[in-house]
Regions:
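Ligand-binding face of N-terminal immunoglobulin V-set domains in extracellular IgSF glycoproteins
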Residues: 1-22, 31-33
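Extracytoplasmic
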Residues: 2-6, 42, 66-68, 146-148
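Short Gly/aromatic-enriched secondary-structure transition segments
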Residues: 5-12, 23-26, 103, 166-172
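Short aromatic-acidic-glycine turn motif
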Residues: 13-23, 159-163, 175
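Extended, low-hydrophobicity, Ser/Thr/Pro/Gly-biased non-transmembrane segments
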Residues: 31-46, 50-52, 61, 72, ...
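Short strand-edge motifs at loop-to-beta-strand transitions and within beta-strands
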Residues: 67-71, 82-84
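Short, flexible loop/turn segments at beta-strand junctions in immunoglobulin-like
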Residues: 73-77
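Short Pro-Gly-centered flexible turn/kink motifs
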Residues: 78-88
Length: 179
């Protein structure tokens, strides 16, 4: 409905940072808290603007505010059909216990690593309220957009990955890992 000079990202994984609003609200040891001293949250070393013509890529600054982050764009995304492509490099630690759609669980056949929806995504935007930048506090669901994401996973060869979507590539890296 209007040009967008910046984008907001949901960073829900930051709920597990011991200083997040949600972690402080819920306290230690509770469902959304940081059990056993676990201090989570994203490590986001880089956000890159991808040029559609294959030109030089541009690093973008991400300002993080608890469980959301703002990216100021060099050129606004045009209204009514504009498009911007960018890449977010990120990582986060999994707690050594199951916690709200993520965690590590040891079972008789091995270990299950559960990641679910924990990836940065563009916040919902509408022409009535604008950006939905409410912090994620753990309880309840979140308001999201539908869209396409390309996710790259690198896992050891003996791991099984369960996911929705379409497998785009089946590569083996130099260390014999499936990528």
């Amino acid at each position: 409905p209007e040009p967008l000079p910046y984008l907001w990202l949901t960073l829900e994984q930051n709920l597990f940072d011991k200083e997040s609003t949600g972690a402080l609200m819920w306290g230690k040891g509770l469902r959304f808290g940081n059990r056993d001293g676990f201090d989570g949250g994203y490590d986001i070393p880089r956000v890159t603007l991808l040029q559609p013509t294959g030109g030089s890529q541009q690093l973008l600054k991400l300002d993080v505010y608890d469980t959301v982050g703002r990216i100021d764009l060099p050129t606004p995304v045009a209204a009514r059909g504009g498009e911007v492509n960018f890449e977010v490099e990120y990582a986060f630690d999994l707690p050594p216990y199951g916690s709200d759609r993520m965690g590590v669980e040891k079972v008789e056949q091995g270990t299950i690593f559960q990641l679910a929806q924990w990836f940065p995504a563009v916040c919902a935007f509408d022409d009535v309220h604008g950006w939905n930048t409410l912090p994620y506090l753990g309880a309840g669901e979140f308001h999201t957009n539908f869209g396409d994401c390309e996710i790259a996973l690198t896992v050891p060869r003996d791991h099984i990955v369960g996911a929705t979507g379409e497998l785009l590539a089946h590569l083996i890296d130099k260390d014999g890992q499936l990528a």
